[in-house]
Amino acid sequence: MEQHEVLRKVVEKLRDLDIEYMLSGSVAMNFYGQPRMTRHIDIIISIKETQIRRFIDSFNEEFYIDSEMVLKEVSGKGMFNVILNDYIVKVDFILRKDTKYDINAFERRRLVNVGDFEICLISPEDLVPNKLLWAR
């Protein structure tokens, strides 16, 4: 299974759960610049308390997911990851903060075609500052 297929699987789950998201990090950078290989996917999500249990259950079958870590990080607006059991690709979920900047960044995200499906992609003007913030 290719990274593209893992991304599709994750995006379909997020859509089914009605969780707002945007692709970020190195995979998003590939849309705007010189493509490079990466073994993980960064996705910023805006998840509600009422969606957490369904989120965990949805990913639990095909992915390794630490439910305790998810619960801890969601309450602190941190990040957690899942790993597809059959294919070693890590997906980092970064919890969207409730700052004006982060809320506006979600409003600026773009819908792009990736093969035969669409994803929400961080805007280039938000991608660079996010990469700098996460590197600290």
Report residues per predicted region.
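Compositionally biased terminal segments of proteins
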Residues: 1-136
